[in-house]
Amino acid sequence: AGTLGGARYEKGIGPDEDLVFVVDLVAVSASPMYCNEATIPKGTRDGKPTEVKMPVEAPVDDVTTTVLLEGDGPKATKKSYLTVDYVGVSCASGQQFDSSWDREEPITIAMSDATPTDTAFSVIPGWTKGLDGQKQGSVVQIDIPFEDGYGTAGSPPSIGTSDPLVFVVQILKVSDEAPPSPTTTT
């Protein structure tokens, strides 16, 4: 048997035959099931990761933290202020959406039980869950389900609706004290 014009006569399907498929829908998810390979542009400042090992399956239930390099400084708590460098990658697209390395400046964050200030920013829940207990000097990868990221709304245009996120975070400083406010000069 052979093919003629794309028809497969040996299977009994002619070139002008209608086909009907029966499909069992097993599950529906607003969030992607798999992560795309990461594309990280090279940074201009030392230390920026050029590769991020994306999880094969998108994070669904829990925040997962992988220690890439363990520091030996104080441990972060939910009451801590952390100074960090980071790169964030969309699980759905594999594209970098943010990087403090690219802005040429680390940021200071207030963990969930610390009070945000004009110099220490609040963060998504996945950051607090992923950084709690990590040591100053560590580099960690945090895989975050969409519920602990930007939720069903996302953060357009870079973070889609229900998009799981992957961050690589370098913890430069852990402190129990809020950073000082910038001084103004007149």
Role assignments for model-derived ranges:
Residues 1-186:
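Cross-family detector of peptidyl-prolyl cis-trans isomerase
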